[in-house]
């Protein structure tokens, strides 16, 4: 317990991260690896909330000719598929896990109830929040920020395919510069690709730090909660 800097965390996993190199669907090898890393944290006594995206299955913006609200609801359902896959993988490792959804589907998951979520965390269960906020026009980044505030998380761990925040796309620009630290205002003013502006503003208003790091490097989640210098930290000062 001595090397834990953050006792209660919100882990934000993109749908693309769960797809691995396939880019679509679920790569169960990746899901299992992530689950093992989460189990390691649970065994250390870290309380974990998680939000999963749905971009590996559906993105609202993909439905160009669709009603935006309908397309967004389809995206929310996609996050539920990912949440159930992660839950199953964690439970196979013996980790007690609950899925809570913002849209009621009582046959497969609990509805989101803040007090119940807090109780699960206190009992050492992982809580996966799915179906976004339950409202269209809000991203899963905003869901992560909102749920982090509601469960009083110490930090949001934003797992990406890149090892931090850069001034340019590092995949396209060899000389892209990585930031070690940023303020919320930096992110908003410069339009940096961390979270969308709604999510960033919510984190700023509630003083929730955001750590952006690469998910594909084994052990990075453990390093993150231990306070080791990885990725990019976004905070007040």
UniProtKB/Swiss-Prot annotation:
This is Uridylate kinase. UMP binds at residues 54, 72, 133-140. ATP binds at residues 12-15, 55, 59, 166, 169. GO terms for cellular component: cytoplasm. Residues 20-25 are annotated as: Involved in allosteric activation by GTP. Keywords: Allosteric enzyme, ATP-binding, Cytoplasm, Kinase, Nucleotide-binding, Pyrimidine biosynthesis, Transferase. It catalyses: UMP + ATP = UDP + ADP. It is an enzyme of class 2 (transferase). One of its GO terms (biological process) is UDP biosynthetic process. It is found in: Cytoplasm. Gene3D superfamilies: Acetylglutamate kinase-like (3.40.1160.10). Allosterically activated by GTP. Inhibited by UTP. Belongs to the UMP kinase family. Pathway: Pyrimidine metabolism; CTP biosynthesis via de novo pathway; UDP from UMP (UMPK route): step 1/1. Homohexamer. GO terms for molecular function: ATP binding; UMP kinase activity.
């Amino acid at each position: 317990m001595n090397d834990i800097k953050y006792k209660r965390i919100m882990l934000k996993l993109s749908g693309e991260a769960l797809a691995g190199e396939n880019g679509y669907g679920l790569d169960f090898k990746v899901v299992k690896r992530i689950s093992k890393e989460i189990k390691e944290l649970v065994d250390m006594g870290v309380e974990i909330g998680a939000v999963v995206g749905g971009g590996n299955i559906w993105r609202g913006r993909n439905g160009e000719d669709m009603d935006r609200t309908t397309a967004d609801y389809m995206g929310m359902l996609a996050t539920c598929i990912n949440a159930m896959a992660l839950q199953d993988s964690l439970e196979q490792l013996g980790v007690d896990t609950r899925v809570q959804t913002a849209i009621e589907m009582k046959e497969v998951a609990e509805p989101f109830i803040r007090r119940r979520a807090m109780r699960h965390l206190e009992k050492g269960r992982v809580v996966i929040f799915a179906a976004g906020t339950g409202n269209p026009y809000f991203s899963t980044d905003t869901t992560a920020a909102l749920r982090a505030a509601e469960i009083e998380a110490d930090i949001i761990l934003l797992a990406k395919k890149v090892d931090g925040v850069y001034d340019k796309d590092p995949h396209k620009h060899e000389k892209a510069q990585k930031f070690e630290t940023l303020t919320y205002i930096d992110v908003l003013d410069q339009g940096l690709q961390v979270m969308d502006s709604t999510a960033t503003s919510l984190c700023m208003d509630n003083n929730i730090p955001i750590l952006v790091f690469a998910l594909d490097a084994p052990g990075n989640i453990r390093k993150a909660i231990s306070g080791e210098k990885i990725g990019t930290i976004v905070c007040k000062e």
